[in-house]
């Protein structure tokens, strides 16, 4: 049985949100289901979407746990978006958090090398 996972992020304005997330992901959306949403495929059967929901904007959190943290984070930084926070936990897990213009958190995490 196949399951597709969609992680949603509420933004105040779809046009400005789409512009920021296109820069963040380095690509246009995979598809636009309607005038209020934009969807990016971040892995097989895994999607992050933004939705114009102004009263909810700024309260979303989304974490992508990846096998190559630098491979995801470094290109975002090269596109001009700096992380809000970088952490390494006692167990070696690394965590990098970005904030979109509405204040939503989009993070990447990775297991310690060799784990």
PLM regions and their residue ranges:
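Short amphipathic alpha-helices within nucleic acid-binding modules
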Residues: 70-75
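Vicinal oxygen chelate
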Residues: 78-115
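Short glycine-enriched loop/turn motifs at secondary-structure junctions
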Residues: 1-3, 54-59, 89-90
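Conserved short beta-strand elements that form part of the metal-binding/catalytic scaffold
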Residues: 27-60, 105-111
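N-terminal beta-strand motif that seeds the catalytic metal site of vicinal oxygen chelate
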Residues: 1-18, 60-62, 112-115
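Short hydrophobic/aromatic beta-strand element in the GNAT-like acyltransferase core
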Residues: 8, 39, 47, 63, ...
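Conserved acetyl-CoA-binding loop of GNAT-fold acetyltransferases
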Residues: 24-30, 80-82
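Conserved active-site tyrosine of GNAT-family acetyltransferases
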Residues: 17-22, 76, 103
């Amino acid at each position: 049985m196949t399951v597709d996972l969609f992680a949603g992020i509420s933004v105040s304005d779809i046009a400005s949100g789409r512009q920021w997330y296109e820069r963040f992901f380095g690509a246009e959306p995979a598809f636009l289901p309607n005038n209020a949403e934009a969807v990016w495929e971040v892995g097989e059967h895994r999607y992050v979407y933004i939705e114009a929901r102004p009263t909810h904007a700024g309260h979303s959190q989304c974490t992508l746990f990846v096998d190559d943290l630098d491979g995801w984070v470094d290109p975002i930084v090269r596109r001009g978006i700096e992380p809000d926070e970088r952490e390494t936990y006692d167990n070696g897990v690394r965590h990098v958090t970005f904030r979109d213009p509405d204040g939503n958190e989009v993070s990447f995490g990775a297991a310690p090398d060799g784990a």
